[in-house]
């Protein structure tokens, strides 16, 4: 029962669209009318530069970190917690962000929240592996497909977790998280791309699209 409660709480924590809220509060803009309509940190950057992106990133990271600590708390309270229950609790905030009910289940790609969760459950090596891989690709191969970049980031993260000899439950949490991220990448590059194309602008266009569906 307690495990189910933590899974539900973590899903709700992840579903809070902080980047969208930051855009509305600090600049009065809907960041989902920019770029690929993703309600995440990258479109906050497109909509208002670092003034929006920095607080959005901090808050999105923080919700993942808090959820990750709650998942770890399950083990502290009951070391016999089933591996699958812990893994679901760790992946729940990522799913919450990707399928948030506050935005009609059209959430973001969950990169920042994933970073927060894995920093909480695996420490700074995991954070540096994931964030470092994404940043390095942006610097060296910025035009690479997003799906490739995030997939490589997750592969490096999983490799570091394996090198750290983390318990098997981490592999399950990693697989669940990776599955959510891949689904979101597929949606934004195929399903949601159809919406973008109707307004005559590419998925990487920074201009707001009049008539597009906001959050």
Where are these regions (language model features)?
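Helix-coil boundary and interhelical linker segments in multi-pass alpha-helical membrane proteins
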Residues: 1-6, 66-88, 119-126, 161-173
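N-terminal signal-anchor transmembrane alpha helix
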Residues: 2-27
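Cytosolic, membrane-interface loops and tails of multi-pass inner-membrane proteins
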Residues: 20-53, 107, 189-215
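Short, non-helical or kinked segments that cap or interrupt transmembrane helices
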Residues: 29-40, 101-115, 143-153
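Interfacial segments of multi-pass membrane proteins
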Residues: 45-48, 71-74, 92, 111-143, ...
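Multi-pass membrane catalytic core of lipid/isoprenoid biosynthesis enzymes
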Residues: 46-72
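Loop-to-transmembrane alpha-helix initiation sites
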Residues: 126-131, 145-153, 165-178
């Amino acid at each position: 029962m307690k495990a189910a409660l933590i899974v539900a709480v973590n899903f709700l924590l992840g579903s809070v669209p902080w980047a969208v809220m930051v855009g509305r509060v600090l600049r009065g803009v809907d960041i989902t009318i920019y770029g690929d309509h993703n309600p995440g940190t990258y479109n906050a950057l497109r909509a208002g530069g670092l003034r929006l992106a920095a607080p959005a990133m901090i808050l999105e990271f923080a919700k993942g970190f808090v959820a990750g600590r709650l998942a770890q708390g399950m083990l502290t309270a009951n070391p016999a917690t089933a591996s699958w229950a812990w893994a679901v609790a760790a992946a729940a905030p990522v799913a919450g962000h990707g399928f948030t009910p506050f935005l009609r289940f059209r959430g973001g790609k969950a990169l920042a929240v994933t970073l927060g969760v894995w920093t909480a459950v695996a420490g700074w090596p995991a954070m540096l592996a994931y964030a470092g891989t994404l940043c390095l690709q942006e610097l060296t191969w910025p035009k690479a497909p997003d799906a490739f970049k995030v997939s490589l980031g997750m592969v490096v993260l999983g490799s570091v977790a394996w090198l750290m000899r983390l318990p098997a439950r981490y592999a399950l949490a990693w697989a669940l998280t990776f599955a959510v991220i891949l689904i979101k990448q597929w949606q934004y590059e195929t399903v949601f791309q159809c919406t973008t194309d109707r307004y005559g602008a590419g998925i990487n266009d920074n201009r707001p699209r009049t008539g597009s569906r906001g959050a």
